Design a protein with these regions (language model features):
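Eukaryote-biased recognition of intrinsically disordered, low-complexity regulatory segments
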Residues: 2-15
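Short, contiguous acidic and Ser/Thr-rich linear segments
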Residues: 15-23
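C-terminal structural segment of proteins
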Residues: 11, 54-58, 65-68, 95-105, ...
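NAD(P)H dinucleotide-binding glycine-rich loop of Rossmann-like/cofactor-binding domains
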Residues: 78, 82-103
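S4-like RNA-binding module at protein N-termini
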Residues: 55-84
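A basic, amphipathic helix-loop patch mediating RNA/tRNA/ribosome contacts
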Residues: 22-53
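Short, structural beta-strand-to-alpha-helix junction motif
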Residues: 24-28, 52, 72, 279, ...
């Protein structure tokens, strides 16, 4: 038996749903099997955006665009979901729908619902941020405001990849929307039910019922004590690919998404404590003031749909050699706090936590509690090179952290992703930099040393030689920026 003992309940287009299904059933599967076929399946991996829906995960935030193809329906208990069928209010089209009609932005039509939902989510965020008295009014017109609106429009649909018959009308629709006031969706649609959200389905049956969503650390540890080998899920942006791409099954899943201690986030002027279930989106918003290098970089991680779901702990736990956060956390000498159901918390340096290709120190019964980082006031540069600007996997990534006394380096941390079986640092290179002044001769020597030290593979994303050259060039670029030298602007590095 893999069904939960009592159905979960969630709001779908204003109607309360009660559903009992597999632990790993996706929202997209649920929608299409129940006849709501406006939400399309394109890639089944969270890349194309055709399956975009809006989800209100708590009553303190707007509806957020998410990929239904990799979203477990069991995680929606108490939440509110809107699909393209439910977007109109009182039979009046939502402005995003109307704008695409007016500009002839439907392309072939298959991916249009995803574009509509992404734009509607962006509009809702603007209206929600304005508050009840703001009326969702757009920013006053000016050339600078127009530039910002256009950039925001492009960002809103960066997770919708279809370009089949003409992209410009879609951009025109988006820019039209940027100048229109709108009302927050919670004013016209069903909003999250707080009491239902805080409730739990009845789990009086044995644990084999499949899906659990503990709400405290103690409850999480109790579940792990019963089933230490159960699969843990937070955002599921990587784990659910085992289901959608490899036809795997997860009969037992424990969700970390509702444990407040794992969603905790503190960033001060020089340090950060990041709960493992903190989403990329929440981290990006919090990092803007004290960790601008990370704030800038995170706009290159996935898409809005992915950033609304993916988590810091998930990026760490999968230990992918191209995991976007791993070089950054290596360069920051991050400490990983691991918990266990029957042992005290354990602090582990990230350099020891990563054990090889998709291997970590995590053992059955373990989970990542939080990540601790210091050095936010140091000189920081994070780079990612990929074939697409948005929503793409890195071919190579570089993270550089320097402590400087004038132009002399007193501490250096240099980390790379996409160049080996795991993200790595070059300690010998770092040691050689300490006490050195940044000179042209030093940068030339470092460039050569990186070429010698790295031995990446060639694959569909990049050749071995390209990866080596790019890694070396980006390190030199960081050192030149540390000197304050003017650098040419590079699309994807400087305009995120």
């Amino acid at each position: 038996m893999t069904d939960i003992s009592n159905p979960i309940q969630f709001w779908l287009n204003g109607a309360l749903q009660a559903h009992s299904g597999r632990a790993d059933e996706t929202l997209l599967g649920y929608l299409r099997h129940s006849g709501r076929v406006g939400t399309k399946e394109g890639c089944a991996s969270g890349d194309c955006g055709a399956c975009t829906v809006l989800v209100q995960t708590d009553d303190e935030h707007a509806y957020k665009p998410m990929n239904a193809c990799i979203l477990p329906v069991q995680q929606l208990h108490g939440q509110a979901v809107i699909t393209v069928e439910g977007l109109p209010s009182n039979d009046v089209l939502h402005p995003a729908q109307a704008a695409l009609i007016e500009t002839h932005g439907a392309q072939c039509g298959f991916c249009t619902p995803g574009f509509v939902m992404a734009l509607a989510g962006w509009m809702d965020e603007q209206a929600f941020s304005a508050g009840p008295d703001g009326g969702g009014q757009p920013e006053a017109d000016s050339p600078q405001a127009e530039t910002r609106r256009l950039k925001a429009c492009r960002e809103a649909i960066s997770g919708n990849l279809c370009r089949c018959t003409g992209y410009r009308p879609i951009l025109q629709a988006a820019t039209h929307l940027a100048s229109r006031p709108t009302r927050a969706l919670f004013e016209t649609h069903q909003r999250l039910d707080k009491a239902l959200f805080n409730s739990q389905p009845d789990h009086s049956a044995p644990y084999k019922t499949g899906f659990r969503a503990p709400q405290t650390l103690n409850d999480l540890k109790d579940l792990l004590r019963q089933q230490p080998s159960a699969n843990l899920i937070a955002g599921g942006t990587d784990l659910m690919l085992e289901v959608t791409q490899k036809q795997g099954r997860f009969d037992q899943l424990i969700s970390l998404a509702r444990v407040p201690a794992l969603r905790s986030l503190q960033i001060s002027s020089d340090s950060a404590i990041i709960g493992s279930a903190v989403t990329y989106q929440d981290l990006q918003a919090a990092a803007e003031l004290h960790w601008p290098a990370l704030h800038h970089f995170l706009s290159r991680l996935g898409s809005p749909q992915i950033r609304n779901r993916g988590t810091v702990g998930g990026n760490l736990g999968t230990a992918s050699p191209i995991g976007d956060l791993l070089p950054i956390l290596l360069a920051m000498d991050a400490t990983i706090v691991m918990s266990h159901f029957e042992a005290a918390d354990q602090n582990v340096a990230i350099s020891e936590f990563l054990q090889g290709y998709r291997k970590t120190q995590l053992q059955p019964g373990n989970f990542i509690k939080e990540v601790q980082v210091t050095g936010l006031q140091d000189f920081l540069r994070y780079y990612k090179i990929s074939k697409r600007q948005e929503d793409d996997i890195a071919a190579v990534s570089v993270a550089v952290r320097l402590k400087l006394d004038a132009d002399q380096i007193t501490l250096a941390r240099i980390a790379f992703g996409g160049v080996a079986e795991q993200a790595l640092r070059l300690p010998a290179l770092e040691q050689a930099l300490q006490g050195q002044a940044i000179t042209e001769a030093l940068m030339t020597a470092l460039h050569q040393q990186v070429l010698i030290a790295l031995n990446p593979i060639s694959d569909v994303r990049a050749s071995r030689d390209y990866r080596r050259e790019m890694a070396a060039n980006l390190l030199v670029r960081a050192l030149k920026e540390a000197l304050g030298l003017p650098m040419p602007q590079i699309y994807g590095l400087d305009d995120a």
